Amino acid sequence: IGVVYTKNGDYSAILRMENPVQKYSANIDSYYEFTQLFTAICQTLGEGYAIHKQDVFTRKQFKDESTDKHEFLSEAYFRYYEGREYTDSSTYLTITQENKKSSLFSFDHKKWRDFMVKVRKVHDQLKDAGVKASFLGKQDTQEYVDRFFAMNFRDKTVSMTGFKVDEETIGMGDRRCKVYSLVDVDCANLPSVIRPYTNMEVNSTSMPVDLLSVVDNIPGVQSVVYIQIIFMPNQKKELAVLDKKKNRHASMPNPSNLIAVEDIKRVQDVIARENKQLVYTHYNIIVSVAPNVDIQKSTNHIENAFGRTGIHISKRAYNQLELFVNSFPGNCFGMSEDYDRFLTLSDAAVSMMYKEKIVHSEDTPFKVYYTDRQGVPVAIDISGKEGKNKLTDNSNFFVLGPSGSGKSFYVNSMVRQAHEQNTDIVLVDTGNSYEGLCEYFNGKYISYTE
């Protein structure tokens, strides 16, 4: 396990994981299962820990990276998509233990052992929930930190450049970055009730999508990193502070104070009745654009998209460099307790995490290519039995559709790709649509007549 140390002596382990919810799957239960999983992880870690999830979205150009030699039609297929832009995503989960003494030289063997036990527990929880996750080693951890520092997630080699910082953006070499804090603690504009998903209208039909689905399609960007940080404080201490706040508001009766008292009572009731956990959270979006791109267009898109969900982006994120540095993997405890964190319940905090995954090619020796919703080829094992995740041991399937619906077009494409991979095919058809295909491949053609 690669471990990141900060100058204050905090140490962190980084997991590369895959979000469990398939994009556009319309499965509401999977969003709630994600919420339950990460709420349980917060309970497992407890006081003095933080989870720091980073979802990285990168605009790339499609390039066929398979080493196989293709026949003419397959070569033409991949050439057609060459250079097409699409969004790729990757997710990292950093688990950090705070060093209260704020010194690199205050090593505590007992705390270190507790840290190693808990990070392995989190890994087991993710694995038991069916989430793909693996710890980054020393070299991968170093590479990820360097890429984050340069905000470069697509080039094979990464170079460091100087920073030029103002109140609005951070300039670094051939790109500019801007950090958008989701919540202004002086004016927390969040909906009073939050769910882990929102509904999108598709052809007059409601479809559930991630509450934060807007972060993966921001126009004009090179890279986007959605930062989600949850800090686990001492529960008794926070409840005592809440009680003091309630009494202070109650001592000065006016409408706003009475509303505050009611809100605090409601939170205390939920904690007592349902054993909920109080957490501090911070969310921000780091956007990277080319120097000749107007970043205001991205700003307008983000503000409008989040405004529709009832979340209003902070307009006072003038501490750009501080936010960027404290968003580094393992450096989250540098976030200001007064201005960059806000208190809420753990399940509400987890609801604002990004939960979806973008489709990637399957890990299988048998590849049949389809285009995904972004219009780029994705390899799928349609047999369901050759890949790493075996779904069945029966490779039969049935193609049904009315005349002119494209059955032959699909079957010809699929048979061609399967034949290129030395697959034996038995094709049963009503009519003689595939007689020519059979002759082309020197197959055996059997027909029946009454």
Segments and roles (model prediction):
Residues 28-31, 35-43, 365-448:
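Glycine-rich phosphate-binding loop of nucleotide-binding enzymes
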Residues 348-353, 358-375:
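Pre-P-loop entry segment of helicase/translocase ATPase cores
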Residues 1-356:
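Extended, folded cores of ATP/NTP-driven motor/assembly subunits in large transport
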